[in-house]
Amino acid sequence: MLNSNWINYAKPFAMLLLMVGLRITAVNAQTGNSFAYNDTAFLLNGKPFQMISGEIHYPRVPKEAWRHRMKMAKAMGINTIGTYVFWNVHEPQKGKYDFSGNNDIAAFVKIAQEEGLWVVLRPSPYVCAEWEFGGYPYWLQNEKGLQVRSRETKYIQAYRQYIMQIGKQLATLQIHKGGNIILVQVENEYGSYSNDKEYLELNRKMFVEAGFDGTLYTCDPAKDVDKGHLPGLFPAVNGLDKPSQMKSLVRKYNNGKGPFFIAEWYPAWFDWWGEKHHTVPAENYSGKLDTVLAAGISINMYMFHGGTTRGFMNGANYYDSSGYEPQISSYDYDAPLDEAGNATPKFWQFRNAISKNLPAGTVLPDVPSAKKVISIPAITLKKQVSIFDVLPKSKSSSNPLTFEALNQAYGYVLYRTTLNGGKAGILKIKELRDYGIVMINGKRVGILDRRLRQDSLFLKLPAGKITIDILVENLGRVNFGPHLLKNLKGITQSVLFNGNELKGWQMFSLPFEKLDGINFTATAKKSDAPVLKHGEFTLEETGDTYLDMSKWGKGCVWINGHNLGRYWEIGPQQTIYVPAEWLKKGKNELIVFELIHTDKTLLDAVTQPELNKLRK
């Protein structure tokens, strides 16, 4: 979601810095570049510097498109890129690290430097960000007694090992070492969660141990700065865009001094399934942006470009009042750049506001030309395979096992048991996480949805021995709030029929990390169970496009091996963005996993997104 933290570390040299009027200085001996701040301003190479930062998350944008998005940022007047670093992306399994391809965070930072942009790095390790488990890897929950965002020993040990790996990738890219990282954030809106200053100090020490010895900071919403700020570190503030109030708050926690940084300035908001798409007119914010910049306040725009939360990496909110709210795959955010990287009205109005506040004579770069959008004829998915025909070897247990117990992070698990039929009653799944399709002898008989607080289903069982299958989907672990510590997935307790607990379960893991080796067959036969559909289409040219999923039910889509994300007929998102970078001239492969409307075979492509169509 939205979190950022400003921290400054200069203990060994504190007295010296104070003598020269600076509280933190990072100098690169080779190039002479330095970043610092005094009582009123940030200083870049000794001169006042106003950060105009835009947030872009590298996993949400194809690697091939990173440079384009940065060129767009610079053309709007952005001089800095902010990004979280996502633990579950880089350590998907304990001790196994991945910095390749779209996870190459060092390449992302270096491209920003090549484009003349500074970087605000936010390794936290908690990111919120509408991201699965707030960025934490699922396997942390398998460590007995581990408690995230605390001084608990197992958590700190895992966290330290991870942040050391991040340091190996990025510490040398700080400004005083020849790079372009000017700020590094420690933790993330911690005041919204707790107030343990010793834990925050542990964070600071680990960052320094990992090589992040430049300018560190913390960030919190205005109401939580007292709890989330670590004395001695710079307090940035999220969401407060009234200059007098913002400056007063920073001075309160920074010994009466500046400078001033809105670490998350929100041009709109995110979306979740079953609720309308959030938009805010550009004119509602362009004036606010002008006011903030005119007051000399630095900002990080959350988001400048949201992109797409692909695969199964969306998070969820959970509140006792509203319940479970999984977020959609589009992270459009009604940002200055839309999901595909195109300029929106906000882009142009924000560009004007920024231009007014730049030094006299400054000329912004030309805006890159509009991206090509292509129309694809309707695609027929001629082949399919039932979920029952792709089941792997099962794991048996008396009681249902969670995803975590199966060492599975995301996707689906099929739970199977048998019982004697010839009776009717209530099937109850205690603590279903999150969406379950119930099948009797291979035929769907009902759906249970955690969003709707559904856990029970009336069943009339046929005579004889029957098989009950329950396909459970992880719709995204909670990424914000106290329920962060209650994030197991699957059937997390028990299954009852007429009050009697069902035993003797088989679990089939379906993480769908790769779809290699699946044998699709050409058939018109309707499946009573969820199906994987396969089709091909040929292109003479590539460009961005959108798949119209409004006639389908629920599932996810792969193009040429890339998991593009989820779709769900309830909306508001009805289209899936297909980036040009993942299409190719000639033959392209399309796979759809459809849970509900298994008879569908035709898929349309459109040239415009549909992100605001609800279907209750």
Name each model feature, range by range.
Residues 155-230:
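Active-site neighborhood of glycoside hydrolase catalytic domains
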Residues 209-210, 241-338, 342-345, 349, ...:
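Catalytic-core region of carbohydrate-active enzymes that cleave or remodel glycosidic bonds
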Residues 104-121, 144-181:
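An active-site-proximal structural segment forming one wall of the substrate-binding cleft
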Residues 51-62, 87-104, 141-161, 185-196, ...:
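The substrate-binding groove and active-site-proximal loops of carbohydrate-active enzymes
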Residues 424-439, 468, 537-560, 567-568, ...:
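Aromatic-lined ligand-binding clefts that engage carbohydrates, nucleic acids, or primary amines
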Residues 28-80, 110, 542:
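N-terminal carbohydrate-binding accessory modules
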Residues 94-103, 114, 124-150, 200, ...:
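Aromatic- and acidic-residue-enriched segments that line the glycan-binding/catalytic groove
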Residues 66-132, 204-209:
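Aromatic-lined substrate-binding rim segments of carbohydrate-active enzymes
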